[in-house]
Design a protein with these regions (language model features):
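Catalytic core of non-heme Fe(II) oxygenases with the double-stranded beta-helix
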Residues: 59-61, 65-191
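Non-heme Fe(II)/2-oxoglutarate
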Residues: 1-80, 84, 119
Length: 191
């Protein structure tokens, strides 16, 4: 499974502390979707951290999620266009051309060691199924499908370079754990 990689101790202690402080204290101020062209210098701390990790070879999409709720099984793609279609027309255009990033990175910024649940689920053998919607609330893994389970840990990162279906479980002990903070970013060849 060369298309899925896992790294530990991704950031040095100072960078990690600064990133945690920024994401946890300013989460509400961070736009939901962010994009940076490969020719642009970083406009903010998040872009600085990401560019230090992956360089400037490709365009960059990134977002932060500090949430204890589940996300449905999905693939990373041109979701923004699908959301615009839903807003304008009430549904995703079934004929919309699906575009996928070169890769997806999930950097765990802050994970409480007491967290129960909140695991990342990846279907390592299931790429996007042509004809399905990007924002597909009806997708369910077929019985017997292989699912890789990743227990998030602070300063660890998961990377995959195929449009794989993935999801996040609900954190089950939200009486104790208030944050499950991750920085996600994807490289794009074209805009």
């Amino acid at each position: 499974m060369d298309h899925i990689q896992y790294a530990k101790n991704v950031l040095d202690e100072g960078t990690l502390n600064n990133l945690q402080q920024f994401c946890l204290q300013h989460y509400e101020e961070i736009p939901i979707y962010n994009f940076a062209r490969k020719t642009e210098k970083p406009k903010n701390y998040l872009e600085e951290v990401i560019r230090d990790l992956i360089g400037y070879d490709n365009h960059l999409e990134y977002w932060v999620r500090d949430d204890t709720q589940a996300t449905l099984m999905h693939v990373d793609a041109n979701e923004l266009q699908a959301k615009i279609d839903r807003y304008k027309y009430g549904e995703e255009d079934p004929h919309m051309i699906k575009e996928f990033p070169l890769n997806t990175h999930i950097l765990y910024v802050f994970i409480d060691p007491k967290m129960e649940g909140g695991k990342l689920l990846i279907m390592p053998e299931q790429e996007y199924i042509p004809g399905r919607k990007i924002l597909d609330t009806t997708f369910r893994p077929a019985e017997g499908s292989k699912i890789m389970v990743v227990k998030p840990e602070t300063n660890h990162m998961v990377l995959f370079d195929k449009p794989l279906y993935h999801a996040v479980e609900t954190v089950t002990n939200t009486d104790v754990v208030k944050h499950r903070c991750a920085l996600m970013f994807s490289s794009w060849k074209k805009i």
